[in-house]
């Protein structure tokens, strides 16, 4: 359990839509943060077995928009063959105003780059004109699996194969905007480098 407090000033330029410009101003928000973490991994780093389930709730205490945030993360780890580490994960996030106000531009949902690799961060989902504005909801499913080491004495470097699928949708402040509810996906090869820092 924790609290968080934010003061922010939202500014827009002449290219912003009328509804975006209407959100200009100064805001003070205070939230009660509830975090639930059930961790059954065999180890925190280079995990090869177990799972971790996390749920985060941000409850508005003092807020102009009274935005309620929910985030859920689930990771399952397994060893598919000797010296392999595989990870399957689910990510869900939502933001909604409990007083039927528009969710602020700064509180809207964007996908973390780790949830949809190969796409430019912040440039997926609903658009208002030329601006990517994020959504009210996001979901992602990810799978990654290490492949046999290509070089000897490279214990700190993992080569892996990954598949990502994700979506962002929902625009509460203007129902005329196409929320671009389309699943994006990617697959590829990556490097996971473990350093002491």
Regions found by a protein language model. Give the residues of each.
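C-terminal outer-membrane beta-barrel translocator/porin domains of Gram-negative envelope proteins
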Residues: 11-156, 161, 169-171
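Short basic (Lys/Arg) and small-residue
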Residues: 164
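C-terminal beta-signal and terminal closure region of outer-membrane beta-barrel proteins
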Residues: 172-197
């Amino acid at each position: 359990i924790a609290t968080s407090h934010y003061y922010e000033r939202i500014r827009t330029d002449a290219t912003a839509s009328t509804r975006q410009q209407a959100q200009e101003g100064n805001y003070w928000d205070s939230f009660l943060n509830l975090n639930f973490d059930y961790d059954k991994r065999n180890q925190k780093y280079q995990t090869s077995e177990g799972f971790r389930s996390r749920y985060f709730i941000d409850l508005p205490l003092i807020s102009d928009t009274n935005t309620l945030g929910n985030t859920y993360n689930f990771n399952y780890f397994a060893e598919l063959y000797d010296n392999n580490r595989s990870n399957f994960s689910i990510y869900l996030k939502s933001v909604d105003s409990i007083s039927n106000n528009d969710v602020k531009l700064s509180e809207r949902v964007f996908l973390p780059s780790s949830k949809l690799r190969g796409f430019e961060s912040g440039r997926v989902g609903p658009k208002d004109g030329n601006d990517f504005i994020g959504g009210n909801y996001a979901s992602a499913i990810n799978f990654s699996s290490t492949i046999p080491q290509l070089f000897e004495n490279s214990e700190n470097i993992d080569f892996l194969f990954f598949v990502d699928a994700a979506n962002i949708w929902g625009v509460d402040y203007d129902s005329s905007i196409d929320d671009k509810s389309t699943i994006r996906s990617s697959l590829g090869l990556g490097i996971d480098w473990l350093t002491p820092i």
